[in-house]
From Swiss-Prot:
Upper taxonomic lineage: Eukaryota, Fungi, Dikarya, Ascomycota, Saccharomycotina
InterPro entries, per database record: Dynein_regulator_LIS1, G-protein_beta_WD-40_rep, LIS1_N, WD40/YVTN_repeat-like_dom_sf, WD40_repeat_dom_sf, WD40_rpt, WD_LIS1/nudF_dynein_reg
Keyword Acetylation: no
GO-annotated biological processes: cell division; establishment of mitotic spindle orientation; microtubule organizing center organization; microtubule sliding; nuclear migration; vesicle transport along microtubule
Region of interest: Disordered: 165-186
PROSITE patterns: WD_REPEATS_2, WD_REPEATS_REGION
GO (cellular component) term, any one: nuclear envelope
Protein family per UniProt: Belongs to the WD repeat LIS1/nudF family.
Subcellular compartments: Cytoplasm, Cytoskeleton; Cytoplasm, Cytoskeleton, Spindle pole
Name of the gene: PAC1
Name of the molecule in the record: Nuclear distribution protein PAC1
WD repeats: 114-153, 156-217, 221-260, 263-301, 304-356, 358-397, 401-437
Coiled coil: 64-94
Pfam families found in the cross-reference section: WD40
Length: 437
């Protein structure tokens, strides 16, 4: 029968067996015969008895090591079972989101990761346990959020990094959001993910995580600070918003600007895209604009905010969850947030559907729960708030998130099987990146 051991492992085992037997008997004839038998499988010359006797205790030591390891494994299994029981009882005591990813909401941060200056943006890698954070010092830090450790620091820009975004390649996974699962076990054949960043140094840079975050493209063309940057869903284009009052569309492959969208009368603070069909932008002029992706022509303006609009996001009806119940005929839903302390939800026809009030200062970031029931927002009032869309947008949780203004929030994309991950990141002026898990 073919051995499962290598020649070296088999030789060590034979040596240990002979050493053990040699301690039990002094019968030289028996030991010589055993030595010859044990050496035969490898085809080598008989090992001298003196050499084998030197390893007399080796087998016993290995056996004791196995016993100790087995005890440790049993002890760890016992501790794990106790921890799982405690976690289960804690979830049930907390009520909301008791073990169900569809209703889980952030409550306690798991890690606090530190920058030396304010954090402006955070973004999760679509496959790996990796988080990127953009800092006012011009650096991007890449964190392993499972370990709470920094992986690398990218000296990205000569001035503050204002936004970062990982592309989200389509894995072909189903969109069943019934359960949460880590993304650690993924195929090497995954689509390529890239990271994009923008800065007040007037450049947009694309980085390759598969090549130690090498800078693979630098996009230039804006005439002033670049406030926001986002990949389109396909990953083929990047859209950017700038203080030069324009939104630009860039080809990832060529690095060229393929379209410039005009229409705003002041600094454009935020942008988003829907299926390379529409572009959404908002800023200091208090207006959210909807433009055609292909032509750049304006389609619609959303009016209602009474102060600077800090951000805008768009969700297709298929991913909108409870938002779809607000207007069954709307093909997508727009969410905007502002320095007027409100969050507003709009239909694809431009109708205002919800106004969420509760923050005591500028609203700086909003994200939709992947299951579609909740909105999570952060603000200069140092809090993170959770809004239940099933209850008409009622605020159901207020979390003291940071010791200073909270500037950004991100929810991890679903795992490779399309299941919700209970994982949120926030960043603040206090220089902290917090992971809520």
């Amino acid at each position: 029968m073919e051995s499962l051991l290598t020649d070296k492992q088999r030789s060590d085992l034979e040596t240990s067996i002979f050493g053990y037997v040699s301690r039990l008997t002094n019968d030289e004839a028996l030991l010589s015969q055993l030595a010859a038998v044990l050496s035969q499988p490898s085809g080598s010359e008989p090992v001298p008895a003196d050499t084998l006797k030197a390893n007399a205790l080796l087998l016993e030591k290995k056996w004791l090591s196995v016993i100790r390891l087995q005890r440790k494994v049993m002890d760890l299994e016992t501790r794990l079972e106790a921890a799982e029981r405690e976690a289960s009882s804690t979830h049930k005591a907390n009520g909301l989101g008791a073990g169900d990813p569809k209703t889980w909401l952030p409550k306690t941060s798991r890690f606090s990761l530190l920058h030396k200056q304010p954090v402006n943006a955070v973004s999760f890698h679509p496959f790996h346990s990796t988080l990127a954070s953009a800092c006012e010092d011009g650096n991007i830090r890449i964190w392993d959020y499972e370990l709470g450790e920094i992986e690398t620091t990218i000296k990205a820009h000569t001035r503050g990094v204002l936004d970062v975004d990982f592309s989200q390649p389509d894995t072909g996974a189903s969109r069943d959001k019934s359960h949460d699962k880590p993304r650690a076990d993924v195929s090497h054949a995954q689509p390529r993910a890239l990271l994009v960043s923008c800065s007040s140094d007037l450049t947009i840079r694309i980085w390759d995580p598969q090549n130690e975050y090498a800078n693979v493209k630098t996009l230039t063309g804006h005439d002033h600070t670049i406030s926001a940057v986002k990949f389109t869903a396909s990953g083929n284009h990047v859209i950017s918003a700038s203080r030069d009052k324009t939104v630009r569309v860039w080809s990832v492959q060529s690095g060229y600007c393929v379209r410039t969208v005009h229409g705003h009368t002041d600094w454009v603070k935020s942008c988003a895209a829907l299926n390379e069909e529409f572009i959404f932008s908002a800023g200091i002029d208090h207006v959210t604009r909807v433009s055609e992706f292909v032509s750049g022509d304006g389609k619609m303006t959303l009016l209602g905010h009474e102060h600077v609009i800090e951000g805008v996001a768009v969700y297709p009806k298929s991913a909108a969850g409870c938002l779809a119940k607000l207007d069954k005929t709307s093909s997508y839903f727009v969410v905007s947030w502002s320095r007027d302390k409100t969050i507003r939800v709009w239909s694809s026809r431009g109708d205002p559907l919800l106004i969420l009030r509760g923050h005591d200062n500028w609203v700086r970031g909003v994200v939709l729960h992947p299951a579609g029931r909740y909105l999570v927002s952060v603000s200069d009032d140092k809090t993170m708030r959770c809004w239940d869309l099933e209850q008409g947008g009622r605020c159901i949780r207020v979390v003291d998130a940071h010791g200073h203004f909270v500037t950004c929030v991100a929810w991890a994309p679903n795992d490779v099987n399309g299941r919700v991950r209970c994982l949120v990141a926030t960043g603040g002026v206090d220089g902290q990146v917090k992971v809520w898990q």
